[in-house]
Regions:
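Residues lining hydrophobic/aromatic ligand-binding pockets adjacent to catalytic sites
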Residues: 1-114
Length: 114
């Protein structure tokens, strides 16, 4: 099972491997709250700044981010982690429901055909 949640939310038994997918380490988060930090899977600085969590740009953000992911070799590492574990949780810090972890989950589910 693949899920997403805020890194600040409480740990749960079904989280499985907890993978932080943000470029920057979130404030106040201790290292033992995250199993793996894949900062290179996050959107480019250019794309992140362009999007700026503007809901009107969400669909275009996803399209551009999916293009970046299709060229990112770290996706293979992430897919291997997900396939190795029964459960995986993509962690993000944003308060916005439209964020890179949600988009990444959508992309991975297409790749995995879930």
């Amino acid at each position: 099972m693949l899920k997403v949640k805020r890194v600040y939310d409480p740990l749960e038994n079904d989280d499985g491997i907890r993978i932080l997918v943000d470029k920057l380490w979130p404030r106040g988060v201790q290292k033992d709250q995250v199993d793996v930090w894949l900062k290179d899977i996050a959107p480019s600085d250019e794309l992140r700044k362009w999007y700026n969590h503007d809901p009107n740009k969400w669909e275009e953000f996803k399209r551009k981010y999916f293009e970046e992911l299709s060229r990112n070799h770290k996706v293979e590492i992430l897919l291997q982690l997900i396939e190795k574990e029964n459960n995986a949780t993509l962690l993000f810090a944003s308060k916005s429901p439209n964020n890179n972890a949600v988009a990444l989950k959508e992309y991975l589910e297409k790749v995995l055909k879930v």
